C-alpha cells in the first residue's frame, strides 16, 4: 500500500515559522509622535512615541514655582503669563497663586503651570508672637527685652535697657502691690529678701504700654504695634509679660499690602480665594 506524507505544520511548528519570519524581517523606522501596535508571541505590544521625552522640547509648560517676595513673583509672572492667566490671593494662608495656563473663556487648558508666592514671617515677628500673652519670670522678661532692643521704639531702646536691668536687679525681691500712676506707668512695690538687704522696701516703675516696630513678612513693610504690660503678684516673685494689640489685623494689613502691590504690577485682576 502506498503511504502518504502529511506536510501540514503543527501549531507549534507554525509558531516557529512566524517567529523566524519576524526575526528575519527588516527593522522599520517609527515616526515620533505616533502610537504603534505589534502582534508578538506574547500578545499585542504597544509602542507610544507621543511623550515629551521623544521631542526636542516639551509640549507645554508644567510645574509649580515657589517664590518668597513680591518682586520675584512679578518677574516670573511677567515672563510666563498671558491674557488668560489667573491670580488668586488666599488671606488665610498668606499665599498668592498664579495659574499661568488657566482656562480661557471658550476653551479648557491644563492649569498645570503655576507660580506661588508663599510669604514667610520674620524671626522677630515669630518670636514676639510666640511670647504674646505669656507671663515670664523677671529674669526671662528682662532677657527678652534685651534680646529685642532693635524692635523697641517707645520708650526707646536705651530706656528699655535700663528698665530691663532694673528688673534684673530686684529678681530676688518679694513684690507686694502694684499701682497705676497718672503718667500711665506702673509702680510695683517690693521688699528685699536678700540677706544683706532683707526688709528694705523699694519701688519699680515700668511703662504700662510700649511700642514695638515689627516687619511681619520677609522683605515686606514694617508696622508699629502697641504692647500692654501684664504682671502678676502673688506675694512673692514677680511675673511679667505683654499683650500685643490686634496682631492678626496687622498680618492681614501686611498681606493686603502685598496683594495691592501685585495687583498694580499685573494686568489681570487678583481674585480672592484659591485655585482648583
List each language-model region with its residue ranges:
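Charged, low-complexity surface segments at secondary-structure and domain boundaries
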Residues: 54-62, 125-130, 147-148, 244
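Short N-terminal edge-element motif at the start of the domain
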Residues: 120-136
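An N-terminally focused, membrane-permeabilizing/fusogenic/translocator signature enriched
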Residues: 1-102, 265, 269-276
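Alpha-helix boundary/N-cap detector
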Residues: 61-68, 132-136, 140, 155-158, ...
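Generic detector of well-ordered alpha-helical segments enriched in charged/polar residues
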Residues: 71-78, 97, 139-146, 150, ...
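Membrane-inserting effector segments that mediate pore formation, membrane fusion
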Residues: 133-183
